[in-house]
């Protein structure tokens, strides 16, 4: 039997949060997931049937839009063939293990009181800028996201980027457009010290490296590496996971009367 993930969740709080934010009960959430599951069964070009947690994740980040959830789920598989240089790199490969020490990129095991996941990112000041590889950093992120999709019960996230380890050489190795895209994709707040973090998050969650009372970055890194090891069968499978475009169904057509395909499936609600 596969041991559970080290990411802590509370399903009661999880579904309470969904109800407060979207007005959906657990039963309704399960019905949405079932709609997406039944549609997924017809996608013969996919290399596998998505996990229920993966379908749930797509539903939540799509804010219960079935149409958008379909697109996200399909892209999850399609992108692996479009970017093989990213998705064929195993988290247990020596280069990734080494780079995880150069650039810390870790989820905090315990969620916040409002059941949101914190990701902590920091460059290790013990390494030189030339040791940092932006491609491997992005690969680290995809590995972490895979863990979240398959194992987590959080759908709101906070990314803490500690810039204390950044040197001039790092900036020279990062294209300005990458920084611009980051500012567009994420709502960013900048602070000169960690005091603002202690105001926003429980001190027990944050790494000891910045004065928190949680685990150290080294300990968090080792936990994530163990999680990758636990999920070895999954990451082994991802190495060759590709869509068969010759089997892709015709693109879904929206109906003038019914609207987006699948968005208005009847839900059995009490």
Where in the sequence are the language-model features?
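Basic, amphipathic alpha-helical/coil surface patches used to engage anionic, phosphate-bearing ligands
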Residues: 1-270
């Amino acid at each position: 039997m596969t041991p559970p993930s080290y990411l802590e969740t509370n399903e009661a709080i999880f579904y309470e949060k969904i109800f407060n934010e979207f007005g959906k009960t657990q039963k309704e959430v399960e019905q949405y997931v079932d709609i997406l599951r039944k549609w997924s069964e017809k996608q013969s070009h996919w290399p596998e049937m998505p996990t229920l947690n993966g379908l749930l994740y797509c539903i939540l980040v799509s804010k219960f839009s079935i149409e958008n959830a379909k697109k996200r789920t399909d892209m999850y598989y399609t992108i692996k063939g479009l970017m093989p240089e990213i998705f064929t790199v195993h988290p247990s490969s020596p280069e990734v293990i080494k780079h995880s020490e150069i650039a810390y990129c870790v989820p905090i095991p315990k969620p916040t009181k409002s059941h949101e996941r914190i990701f902590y990112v920091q460059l290790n000041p013990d390494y030189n800028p030339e040791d940092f590889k932006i491609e491997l950093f992005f690969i680290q992120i995809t590995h972490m996201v895979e863990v979240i999709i398959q194992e987590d019960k959080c759908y709101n996230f906070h990314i803490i980027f500690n810039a204390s380890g950044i040197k001039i050489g790092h900036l020279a190795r990062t294209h300005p457009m990458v920084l611009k895209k980051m500012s567009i994709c994420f709502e960013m707040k900048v602070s000169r010290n960690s005091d603002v973090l202690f105001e926003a998050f429980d001190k027990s969650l944050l790494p000891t490296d910045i004065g928190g009372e949680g685990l150290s970055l080294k300990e968090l890194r080792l936990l994530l590496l163990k999680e990758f090891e636990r999920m070895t069968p999954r990451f082994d499978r991802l190495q060759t996971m590709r869509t068969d475009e010759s089997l892709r169904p015709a693109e879904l057509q929206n109906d003038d009367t019914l609207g987006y395909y699948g968005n208005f499936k009847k839900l059995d609600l009490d």
